[in-house]
């Protein structure tokens, strides 16, 4: 049983508090099984640990039994040394950006080790080959380079913070143009507060918001998003509202192109928004890669 970082998301189904959500997540821990957990809030970790003990299940937590030993930026991603349940694995090339993706890699590694009993290391060549082939469409996915356009499907405050940290580390831009659309059941205020903290309060880069919506019936109207963004502390002078996503993308890209290599466009806030953006900005077939081939509808079903 593998548990990723638990945050406040899907509260309509899982509960309104971390404790309630953690209790739901703990339901996947099977008798005499094996719990592999990411680093968690102490309250969440306690619930998971108590459940594992009641189920007589083995358990391992990131940062205790396994984790990232060393992490360095690399072209197209990062270079990792991971500590698993049964060994250490240096010089792993992971073609994904962000500290959180390194942590996800350690979680995946420990899960596979646990599947094989957790008492022997995996073959190094298999580990290297496996991570080298990792793709995560819609997660800091660069679909254009002139201007830079990056899609990220983060749709809750926790995810937006992780993606923002990784985006700033990977691309080091002085001008960020963010095209944002959010679905109605999500914590829009929390998302905007994180965006303000990450791009306005803690960086010298200029930042602009282009608020729009996908075609989903669940999408928050752009005008309502503007009010929420203002409540989150954004200056109205850096906000523009667009009824149609294609217009928001076109203007953001035009502005980024004018600022050349120091600028980029980030599309985020909802899987439906980045799915539609991918369709609108689809590259010619000869330029496509395996990372860009997932259908927007499949992404939306899987992640929202």
Task: Pin down the residues of each PLM region.
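Nucleotide phosphate-binding/pyrophosphate-handling subdomain across enzymes
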Residues: 1-2, 6-7, 11, 20, ...
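Acidic, Mg2+-coordinating active-site environments of NTP-dependent enzymes
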Residues: 3-91, 105-125
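Short, surface-exposed connector motifs at secondary-structure boundaries
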Residues: 27-35, 170-176, 205-208, 235, ...
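Beta-strand->loop->alpha-helix junctions that form or flank phosphate-binding loops
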Residues: 38-39, 53-73, 94-99, 126-133, ...
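C-terminal helical cap/extension that packs against the catalytic core
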Residues: 41-56, 148-150, 157, 190-263
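Short, flexible loop segments at boundaries between secondary-structure elements
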Residues: 214-218, 287-304
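Active-site-proximal loop/hinge segments that shape catalytic or ion-binding/gating pockets
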Residues: 270
């Amino acid at each position: 049983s593998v548990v990723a970082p638990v945050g406040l998301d899907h509260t309509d189904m899982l509960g309104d508090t971390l404790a309630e959500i953690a209790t739901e997540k703990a339901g996947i821990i099977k008798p005499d099984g094996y719990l592999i957990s990411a680093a968690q809030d102490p309250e969440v970790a306690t619930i998971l640990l108590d459940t594992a003990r009641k189920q007589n299940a083995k358990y391992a937590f990131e940062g205790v039994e396994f984790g990232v030993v060393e992490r360095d930026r690399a072209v197209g991603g990062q270079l990792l040394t991971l500590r698993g349940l049964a060994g250490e694995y240096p010089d792993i090339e992971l073609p994904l950006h962000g500290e959180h993706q390194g942590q996800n890699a350690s979680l995946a590694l420990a899960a596979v080790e646990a599947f094989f009993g957790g008492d022997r290391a995996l073959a190094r060549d298999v580990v290297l080959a496996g991570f080298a082939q990792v793709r995560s469409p819609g997660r800091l996915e660069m679909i254009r380079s002139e201007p830079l356009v990056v899609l990220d499907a983060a749709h809750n405050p926790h995810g937006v913070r992780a993606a923002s940290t990784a985006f700033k580390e990977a691309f080091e831009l002085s001008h960020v143009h963010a095209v944002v659309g959010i679905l109605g059941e999500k914590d829009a205020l929390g998302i905007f507060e994180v965006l303000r903290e990450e791009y306005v309060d803690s960086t010298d880069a200029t930042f602009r918001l282009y608020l729009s919506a996908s075609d989903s019936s669940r999408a928050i109207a752009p005008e309502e998003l503007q009010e929420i963004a203002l409540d989150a502390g954004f200056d109205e002078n850096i906000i523009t509202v667009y009824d149609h996503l294609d217009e928001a993308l076109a203007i953001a890209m035009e502005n980024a192109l004018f600022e050349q290599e120091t600028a980029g466009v980030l599309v985020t806030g909802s899987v439906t928004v980045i799915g539609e953006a991918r369709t609108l900005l689809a590259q010619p077939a000869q330029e496509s890669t395996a990372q860009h081939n997932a259908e927007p509808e499949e992404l939306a079903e899987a992640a929202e």
